[in-house]
């Protein structure tokens, strides 16, 4: 019955949102007709009584955002994040680099860089995720019923990072390096196939609550899992080759109004590549965008589904599938990053996107609902047996109309938790 509840939840979210939209549609067509899309720079130039800036089609656009925050694990944090969107010569689709750099008062470093690039005539598609972190992050155990032994106090997170401390969390310090890069080649319109390499390495792991002294013993989920399945407790990696199939008909990668993105990936980590044991696992992702208005395509329903499937005990603990471990670290708004973890994970989301500014289109909004399920074989918890919902809303500010880059400000609520999110571009 678990999988049925999961599907019913997502369908109900989508149909409920769609019903509300259809009730508004007749009034929007007239308001939207004859309008010209504007962005933040147009508004600023208008306020200064300057003419709109003429921008060549495909010209690059840069959006930078300050990052300021504080939490017990990292201390005070400051940095910058953003996105550069552009079109390669001869390409009909936008490409983008997204990244951030942050430092904290506890000598921590966070560096992220993601790339999604289409070459001339969209013949080749590159996608990459590079990261280096000297970091602290709480863990909670495995499965969507974690943690064991009680219920967490109400949690607050900023940009996916926990800002509160709870006695049931299991904080960890580590250095982390990631290099994910794939290249796919166009087989026919919309279809790509290719290969890649994926590296995730955790080093200098400190399990802060772990105590092994006789008479003063506290065993953490990370320690027990690593001991049970033969992994080191202070370092490990996944180093593997990937085979990838992609179907992409989106009209815009940064902020689609229509189309589908579907990806399937097999990942194989062999011992000769440095892994402690051979592991194979499978991942799929589906994103689809369904316009609800002929006169204004910004009225749309967006659907997102992620599934990652591995065999229990084959992947090291911190490399197991977990919430917000997607390329943009955006899944499961309302919960902190890594809140739910397991050998297998399925995540789904439905989001309604709509304009607020009736003519200029500078302001928009979203409402969303999501659901996460993970397993825990050791506790006989199956996938779909426990499902954790989330929901929320957000504001969108059109920062660059040519690439459709939005400044996104969201609030999300989960079970006994809250999150605030600020980002360049849509969540998915």
Where are the regions a protein language model picked out?
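Bacterial Sec-dependent N-terminal signal peptides
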Residues: 1-28
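C-terminal hydrophobic structural anchor segments
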Residues: 353-390
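Transmembrane beta-strand segments of outer-membrane beta-barrel domains in Gram-negative
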Residues: 25-44, 50-51, 138-295, 371-377
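Membrane-embedded beta-strand positions of outer-membrane beta-barrel proteins
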Residues: 64-66, 97-101, 126-130, 193-195, ...
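C-terminal outer-membrane beta-barrel translocator/porin domains of Gram-negative envelope proteins
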Residues: 231, 241-244, 250-358, 362
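Short loop/turn motifs that connect adjacent beta-strands in outer-membrane beta-barrel proteins
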Residues: 50-60, 88-95, 120-125, 186-190, ...
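Gram-negative/organellar outer-membrane beta-barrel architecture
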Residues: 55-63, 70-231, 339, 404-408, ...
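Residues that define the transmembrane beta-barrel architecture of outer-membrane proteins
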Residues: 60-62, 74-78, 93, 107-111, ...
